[in-house]
UniProtKB/Swiss-Prot annotation:
GO terms for cellular component: bacterial-type flagellum basal body; plasma membrane. Pfam families: Bac_export_1. Its main location: membrane. One of its GO terms (biological process) is bacterial-type flagellum assembly. InterPro entries: FliR, T3SS_IM_R. It is a multi-pass membrane protein. Keywords: Bacterial flagellum, Cell membrane, Membrane, Transmembrane, Transmembrane helix. Role in flagellar biosynthesis. This is Flagellar biosynthetic protein FliR. The chain crosses the membrane at residues 11-31, 36-56, 75-95, 127-147, 190-210, 219-239.
């Protein structure tokens, strides 16, 4: 009797592990390529954290995977990995809004070639972009945004989006979803950087008028130093309002991410 109980418990553990594995693959791919957990320095943490989350979330899933056909199960794992990458792609769009703001701003004040090594992404990035990225991380970690990130990106997505519906995906709806995400990226980046860019544009317009009226003025030296000083001054003065607008953008981004997941679930179905 004890022997058969051990066999039944072993079979239960095997079936449970095969149920957890697809969820683990999706959560791991989502966290691995998200901007907060993408560094290779915490790769082992990603795996164990994904395993813990998958064990918690899998209890709410009432789906039996086809374990009698290993090819079908392998395709399910591949589909779960693709869904995790798609979710990480949308989260990276939110994060890249602030990098794009820094890119716009750096080009206008003459710091396009001033780069700094980012220890998290392990690549060079512009100084102003790095400042905006750190601002984003501080705002993200100082509020309930991180909790909402896990609830929307892991809990809601696993419960609402199933990999079995990938075969019924309409290409037109998915392309529309991608175009909406890119439009969201440029819209939010321009909204944040528009006041700064408009002042710098006005400054360059004044310089153009001066160059016509006084051709002997060395505008190359004047424009670089003045635009750099003016840009840093605007950044210093407008930093509190910039933090408020950035926080609002993060809130809208998480709401948009939830809307994207709902739209994506309808597209798949």
């Amino acid at each position: 009797m004890y022997y058969w109980d051990e066999i039944l418990n072993l079979n239960f553990l095997v079936l449970k592990s095969f149920t957890i594995l697809p969820v683990l693959v999706r959560i791991f791919m989502f966290l691995k390529f998200s901007p907060f957990f993408s560094t290779i320095k915490i790769g082992y943490f990603n795996f164990f954290f994904s395993l813990i989350l998958s064990v918690i979330v899998v209890e709410k899933i009432k789906i039996i995977y086809p374990l009698d056909n290993m090819l079908s199960f392998a395709l399910i794992l591949l589909g779960e990995a693709i869904l995790g990458l798609i979710q990480a792609f949308f989260v990276n769009i939110i994060f890249n809004v602030f990098h794009l703001v820094g890119f716009f701003f750096s080009n206008q004040i003459g710091l396009a070639y001033a780069n700094i090594f980012d220890v998290f992404s392990e690549e060079d990035s512009m100084i102003i972009s790095q400042i905006f990225a750190y601002l984003f991380l501080l705002l993200f970690l100082s509020s309930d945004f991180l909790l909402r990130f896990f609830v929307i990106g892991i809990h809601d997505s696993v419960l609402n989006i199933r990999v079995e519906h990938l075969v019924n995906m309409r290409n037109s709806g998915f392309v529309k979803l991608l175009l909406m995400s890119f439009g969201f990226l440029f819209e939010k980046a321009l909204l944040i950087s528009f006041p700064i860019l408009s002042l710098l544009l006005l400054f360059y317009l004044v310089l153009g008028i001066l160059s016509k009226s006084s051709p002997q003025i060395n505008l190359l030296i004047i424009s670089f130093s003045t635009s750099l000083f003016l840009g840093l001054l605007i950044l210093y003065i407008g930093f509190p309002s910039l933090a408020i607008s950035s926080k609002r953008v993060i809130e809208l981004s998480l709401d948009s991410l939830a809307s994207f997941l709902k739209l994506f679930s309808r597209v798949l179905k």
